[in-house]
């Protein structure tokens, strides 16, 4: 019985690729050094899979930055601003597209479906001259072959590539990107022909767009593309891989009738309805790549349940045509549990990172072919049983409190406009009040203090003294700049989710559970393994200390429940919304303690609320309902005079604006500076938003210092669609990643712009 892996993490078990990339970018190592580290990583991954008994091992899933960017390079679709003049695309052009350079900005980066990975968006139009400009797929196939490993080269499919693209600057938004299919297919044919010549017998096209809600003309593009490729693909086995959700009945019909295709890959972890489609109709003689091992989480597979699913499928597709596979690439999970020496043994026994998941895939394939490893299956069953019965997982008080939430929608008793009046009487803020989003620059010295405290190299007393000095510096700076509502700067926090997770029960943390977010940037999601509660106050000590240093309002700073959920590895033994409600109750306790401590402005960040939106429109309402409800739970009990802020980190709100209004926050600040018009257009079209709103006036992701007049002009544009009594003036995000040399003048200009507009408004009366 055959086994298959859709894709594997690239960073290496100890983030070797990250450090090699950053060393190369900083000019501390050569291109050859980077290539050597990368070749060693690829070789160890291929050998690991071969040794584990995997039959269909992927190649070309490694990337120096991103697989969609690799496809852009393969097709020679380099935007003109990068000055590429043809020939094989090398690191200089490749990394300029990914990261920008001294003279030109990077290409846009956006989220890969509903994961926390980001891809580089192709910029296309009728003028693009496509040409075969990166032979990476063929070179990596040959590289593996030279090591004695026959692999399945993986390409981003042609239709998904075009549907993931955007119209280049200056190209009309009505331009149909799919009209470029006839221009890119000849290059795909060249790549396929070279792979065939190099000895490839299988090839994998990733077409994840098939899980989206697609109009019929888009589905027809798949049929047309593969019909065109059919003669080139003859003599090869071809698998078309989908992942992250169910395929619709229409997409399934399209997929199983594609010309030249031998097998189909499905996510059977998130795609439970797809299973019914397969059982109802599957083309005879074709292969089913059954994605039963979860590529997006870190829990051990329920091998007995997966085996039962696979045995049922055997009857449908035939024993020799069923391939045990993964739900998606392992890019979205951590690399190897072997490096977790500090994780609690019991919790560790419940987990499987990518390296362990490879073994699970192989164990299932062997069991199907009558060679079941009884010891492996028994150990798995014992781990699952221990997880189910462990007292660490279940907290009855939490379960009871969460159950009691049902039946109420947890709204504050009064309207937002009457609350804002009460808050204004208490806070006495000027018109167009200024604030920042929360974090201030994290200096090398500050990181050292935190690291030494964690390693017990300095005492708690020394740590508190150092953090107190930092808070005092940040408060003083904001007073000198004349900012109206202050923040403490978050010097005690390394990460906005980890900081809270470390103080909540039900969370565990890995040492090396890194997952690629984009380029060399990795994140280490907390693991939510059990019921969540708050044993002690988490932020009250620091917020109270900061408030005692100033007469101005000091914001309490919390991360919201939906963001904590969406940026964690979440337990899979209960629905996500139940876990979210538990986190909401823990945050509610904190909000109430901050209020008691005299904090009158409390910000509950929901940076990732939109990120959790399901891929299919039919599932949006249910998600938004519980996500928004979770937010309201956190602050339902506070007084009218306590002002609740929230912050959101993305530009495309238009489709969820009514849910944002339904959150019932008093003030919302938004990461908006890069897409001004997009957001303001919602309000221009007459959506009445009665609460305070602070669309970011400048982009903190850039070191550029915006001049006062530019900021004043931006505020004027906002005042054209928003009432002056609800508009706040703030940067678009936290300042953690910037330097003080950039932050001070930028904030100074921001305050000056707000004061200028106050004068203009006063003289216009």
Curated annotation (Swiss-Prot):
Q: What is this protein called?
A: 5-methyltetrahydropteroyltriglutamate--homocysteine methyltransferase
Q: Which UniProt keywords apply?
A: Amino-acid biosynthesis, Cytoplasm, Metal-binding, Methionine biosynthesis, Methyltransferase, Transferase, Zinc
Per UniProt, where does L-homocysteine bind? Answer: 437-439, 490, 605
Required co-factor(s) are:
Zn(2+)
Its annotated function is as follows: Catalyzes the transfer of a methyl group from 5-methyltetrahydrofolate to homocysteine resulting in methionine formation.
Q: Does the keyword Electron transport apply?
A: no
List the GO biological process terms. Answer: methionine biosynthetic process; methylation
Residue sites binding Zn(2+) 2 per the record: 658, 662
Q: Record's NCBIfam families?
A: met_syn_B12ind (TIGR01371), PRK05222.1 (NF003556)
Indicate the family of this protein. Answer: Belongs to the vitamin-B12 independent methionine synthase family.
Question: Mind telling me which residue stretches traverse the membrane in this protein?
Answer: none
The entry marks the following residues as binding Zn(2+) 1, namely: 647, 649, 671, 733
In terms of InterPro entries, this protein maps to:
Cbl-indep_Met_Synth_N, Cobalamin-indep_Met_synthase, Met_Synth_C/arc, UROD/MetE-like_sf
Q: Where is the active site?
A: 701 (proton donor)
């Amino acid at each position: 019985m055959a086994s298959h892996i859709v894709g594997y993490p690239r960073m290496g078990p100890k983030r070797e690729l990250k450090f090699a990339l950053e060393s190369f970018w900083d000019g501390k190592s050569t291109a050859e050094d980077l290539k050597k580290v990368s070749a060693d990583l690829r070789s160890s991954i291929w050998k690991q899979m071969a040794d584990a008994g995997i039959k269909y091992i992927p190649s070309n899933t490694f990337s120096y930055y991103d697989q969609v960017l690799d496809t852009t390079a393969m097709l020679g679709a380099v935007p003109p601003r990068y000055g590429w003049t043809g020939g094989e695309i090398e690191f200089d052009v490749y990394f300029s597209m990914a990261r920008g350079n001294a003279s030109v900005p990077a290409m846009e980066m956006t989220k890969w479906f509903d994961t926390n990975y980001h891809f580089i968006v192709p910029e296309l139009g009728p003028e693009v001259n496509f040409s075969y400009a990166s032979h990476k797929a063929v070179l990596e196939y040959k590289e593996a072959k030279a090591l004695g490993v026959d692999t399945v080269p993986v390409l981003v499919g042609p239709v998904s590539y075009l549907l993931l693209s955007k119209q280049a600057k200056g190209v009309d938004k009505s331009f149909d990107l799919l009209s470029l299919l006839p221009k890119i297919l000849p290059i795909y044919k060249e790549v396929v022909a070279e792979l065939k010549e190099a000895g490839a017998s299988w090839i994998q096209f990733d077409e994840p767009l098939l899980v989206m809600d697609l109009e019929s003309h888009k589905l027809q593009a798949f049929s047309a593309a593969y019909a065109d490729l059919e003669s080139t693909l003859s003599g090869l086995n071809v698998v078309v891989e989908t992942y992250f959700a169910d395929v619709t009945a229409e997409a399934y019909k399209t997929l199983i009738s594609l010309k030249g295709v031998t097998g189909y890959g499905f996510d059977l972890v998130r795609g439970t309805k797809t299973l019914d489609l397969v059982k109802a109709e599957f083309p005879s003689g074709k292969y089913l790549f059954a994605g039963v091992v979860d590529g997006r989480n870190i829990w051990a597979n329920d091998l007995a349940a997966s085996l039962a699913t696979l045995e049922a499928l055997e009857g449908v597709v035939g024993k020799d045509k069923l391939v045990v596979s993964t739900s998606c690439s392992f890019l979205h999970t951590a690399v190897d549990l072997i490096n977790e020496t500090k994780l609690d043994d019991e919790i560790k026994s419940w987990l499987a990172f990518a390296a362990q998941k490879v073994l699970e895939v192989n164990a299932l394939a062997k069991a199907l072919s009558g060679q079941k490893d009884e010891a492996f299956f028994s150990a798995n069953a014992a781990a699952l049983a221990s997880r189910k019965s462990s007292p660490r997982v279940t907290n009855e008080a939490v379960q009871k409190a969460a159950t009691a939430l049902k039946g109420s929608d947890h709204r504050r008793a009064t309207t937002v406009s009457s609350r804002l009046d009460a808050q204004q009487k208490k806070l006495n803020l000027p018109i167009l009040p200024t604030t920042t989003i929360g974090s201030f620059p994290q200096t090398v010295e500050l990181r050292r203090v935190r690291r030494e405290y964690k390693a017990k190299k300095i005492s708690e007393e020394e740590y508190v003294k150092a953090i107190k000095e930092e808070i005092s510096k940040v408060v003083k700076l904001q007073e000198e700049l004349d900012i109206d509502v202050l923040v403490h700067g978050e010097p005690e926090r390394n990460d906005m989710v980890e900081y809270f997770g470390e103080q909540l029960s039900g969370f565990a943390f890995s040492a090396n559970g890194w997952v690629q977010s984009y380029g060399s940037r990795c994140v280490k999601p907390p693991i939510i393994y059990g019921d969540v509660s708050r044993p002690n106050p988490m932020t009250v000590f620091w917020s109270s200390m900061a408030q005692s240093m100033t007469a101005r309002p000091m914001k309490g700073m919390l991360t919201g429940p939906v963001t904590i959920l969406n940026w964690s590895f979440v337990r899979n033994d209960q629905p996500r919304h139940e876990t979210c409600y538990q986190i909401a109750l823990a945050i509610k306790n904190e909000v109430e303690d901050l209020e008691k401590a005299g904090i009158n402005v409390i910000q509950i960040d929901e940076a990732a609320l939109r990120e959790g939106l399901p891929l299919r429109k039919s599932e949006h309402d249910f998600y938004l309902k519980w996500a928004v409800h979770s937010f309201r739970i956190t602050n339902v009990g506070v007084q009218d005079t306590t002002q609740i802020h929230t912050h959101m980190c993305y530009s495309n709100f238009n489709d969820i604006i009514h849910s944002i209004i339904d959150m019932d926050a008093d003030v919302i600040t938004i990461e908006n500076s890069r897409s001004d018009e997009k957001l303001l257009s919602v309000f221009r079209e007459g959506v009445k938003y009665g609460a305070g709103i602070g669309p970011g006036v400048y982009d903190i992701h850039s070191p550029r210092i915006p001049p006062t007049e530019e900021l004043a002009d931006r505020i004027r544009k906002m005042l054209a669609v928003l009432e002056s009594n609800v508009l706040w003036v703030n940067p678009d995000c936290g300042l953690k990643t910037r330097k003080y040399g950039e932050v001070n003048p930028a904030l100074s200009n921001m305050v000056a712009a707000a004061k200028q507009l106050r004068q203009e408004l006063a003289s216009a009366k």
